[in-house]
Amino acid sequence: MGIPVTVKSVAPTPTAVVAAAVTWAEFPARWGPMLDQVWRFIRNGAPEGLYQHGHNVMLYKDEVPNVEVGVQVTSSFDAAGPVVSSALPGGLVAVATHTGPVAELGDTHQAVSGWSKARGYQLAGPRWEVYGDPDPSTGRFTVEVYWSLEPGFPTETGEAAGEDGSVVPIIGGLPAAEGSRHRPA
């Protein structure tokens, strides 16, 4: 059974992050210390109310990769050393939930990317992960994997993605709402 993938629209989410340009080979050793810096800031100097129950996040801006590792927060803030204010992107996304070992997280990314391409969606660039809270009895956690999509891009199934995440049929090369205006009465 494949990994279920859905398309939806998400709002930008403010984050406190440490940003870096790394290689994929060095990223596994770098993300932990980056995240530790963010948590030190949140515990020892963040503005009151900045953190209320956000999750750990990793944003991959490109293939370099330029990455941001941090935590969801409630608003933007002034930078404090290496910890800066940023945001997870908003807009149309393909998303799946990873429930297996972290070592297999790449499989979920491949599933989201492959599913999107197979349906004619154009990937828009950034992708990110939002780490859920650990289960108190097992220590296991889920990871939501998001890939940005170009809105309105027609799919091979004869549908188009709306900016709100809706999927509408294509009629005469136009989304149904537009196509219906151009049909003879």
Model features per residue range: what roles?
Residues 1-185:
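A solvent-exposed interaction/effector surface
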